[in-house]
Amino acid sequence: MIRQRTLKNTIRATGVGLHSGEKVYLTLRPAPVNTGIVFVRTDLDPVVQIAANAEYVTDTTLCTALSRDGVKVATVEHLMSAFAGLGIDNVFVELSAAEVPIMDGSAGPFVFLIQSAGIAEQGAPKKFIRIKREIVVEEDGKEARFLPHNGFKVAFAIDFDHPVFAHQKQTASVDFSTTSFVKEVSRARTFGFMRDLEHLRAQNLALGGSLDNAIVVDDYRIVNEGGLRYEDEFVKHKVLDAIGDLYQLGHSLIGEFRGVKSGHGLNNKLCRALMAQQDAWEIVTFEDDTQTAPISYAAPALA
């Protein structure tokens, strides 16, 4: 049986919010079966819980933000991507502010935290969403689609007219039956253009952004001294973002996602379009050991 997963232990970290620039305390706690991923604003009295669900996504300006009853949690996508990549179903994410800390701009530090806490398998079958037919959303020359696929695959294309991108691979296709999320995707950092920074900061955005948590590109080159972590790090980060955005469906996917210049907003529209067409998907579990599951996760390492 493929079982639901949570953490073995509680684990804490501190970082800064990418957009707020504020210090944020993050605590990840184990949660019972069928809880899902739940964000908890512990700085509020009473505390407010917001489930990581596509219907609560209210703002997609440069990040994915959830809100409920006027309370917001922003920049959830990299942490959500780490949960998806490691197959974590149930966890409470406690935050001391309205934004998940940016860490190094990738999902890598969150993967490390989760692995350090340890992964515990639980006494209930893991639920998957299986895509049964194609769903497409399009907007301003961008598109996002789901297709049936016996596994989980993400393909993405970006198209930046910029000297740096002239030498970069702008497409990636990752089949997770043969590729490790941790090794090949999780360390890809968010990226931004120096020319946009002033404009963003005037809107109180990217106040915590720096060379420590993003790839920064000026008019001609990558500013970061260390260069790139992967030769296709830009498009790989878009894959990472998409995995986090799709995990707002509440379950791991059996299917293929294809994005062309898609961002958080279009990814969310695709999730909502899928949920609205109930003949396009089904919930499946793998309780019988004789069934060959199309998706497998690494055995939980001992913490």
Curated annotation (Swiss-Prot):
GO terms for cellular component: membrane. The active site is at residue 264. Zn(2+) binds at residues 78, 237, 241. Its EC number is 3.5.1.108. GO terms for biological process: lipid A biosynthetic process. SUPFAM superfamilies: Ribosomal protein S5 domain 2-like (SSF54211). Transmembrane segments: none annotated. It catalyses: a UDP-3-O-[(3R)-3-hydroxyacyl]-N-acetyl-alpha-D-glucosamine + H2O = a UDP-3-O-[(3R)-3-hydroxyacyl]-alpha-D-glucosamine + acetate. Its cofactor is Zn(2+). GO terms for molecular function: metal ion binding; UDP-3-O-acyl-N-acetylglucosamine deacetylase activity. Keywords: Hydrolase, Lipid A biosynthesis, Lipid biosynthesis, Lipid metabolism, Metal-binding, Zinc. InterPro entries: Ribosomal_Su5_D2-typ_SF, UDP-acyl_GlcNac_deAcase, UDP-acyl_GlcNac_deAcase_C, UDP-acyl_N-AcGlcN_deAcase_N. Pathway: Glycolipid biosynthesis; lipid IV(A) biosynthesis; lipid IV(A) from (3R)-3-hydroxytetradecanoyl-[acyl-carrier-protein] and UDP-N-acetyl-alpha-D-glucosamine: step 2/6. Pfam families: LpxC. NCBIfam families: lpxC. Belongs to the LpxC family. Catalyzes the hydrolysis of UDP-3-O-myristoyl-N-acetylglucosamine to form UDP-3-O-myristoylglucosamine and acetate, the committed step in lipid A biosynthesis. This is UDP-3-O-acyl-N-acetylglucosamine deacetylase. It comes from Chromohalobacter salexigens (strain ATCC BAA-138 / DSM 3043 / CIP 106854 / NCIMB 13768 / 1H11). The lineage of its organism: Bacteria, Pseudomonadati, Pseudomonadota, Gammaproteobacteria, Oceanospirillales.
